[in-house]
Amino acid sequence: MIEQGLRQEINLVTTEAKNRRLEFITVEHLLIALLNIDEVLTFLRGKRINIDELRDELEQYIDSHTPVFPEDVDPDIVPSIGFQRILQRSVYQAHSAQKESVNAMNVFVSIFSEKESHAVSMLKLNNISRLDVMEGISSQLADT
């Protein structure tokens, strides 16, 4: 139900988090995954967002706030509750709209429901709102 490119990017950030021995994969990881998908990049560039700066800030936050497994423990990474809710919300919304799959922009909109996340704070600092993303989806649909 999740588009292949999005699934691959989520798998990549999950693998990276596991290699770094992180206990959780978070909303911030999910936003980093989205930063590797063309439709999200096109939208953010249209808003004149510095993608590298946003990615660096998210990675710094993850490094300083995500617990790490000790060396003597085999890491078994767990998705955070927020991460799970975003994906569940995206699947539900796609199903409600009678879409066959969830794409990156659907997930991007769902991130804004996790108001307490650092990812949403970073987006707001860059003057990106849920409404902006929804308008971006409408614009992309009109272009196709």
State the predicted function of each range.
Residues M1-T144:
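Histone-fold recognition with a strong bias for associated Lys/Arg-rich disordered tails
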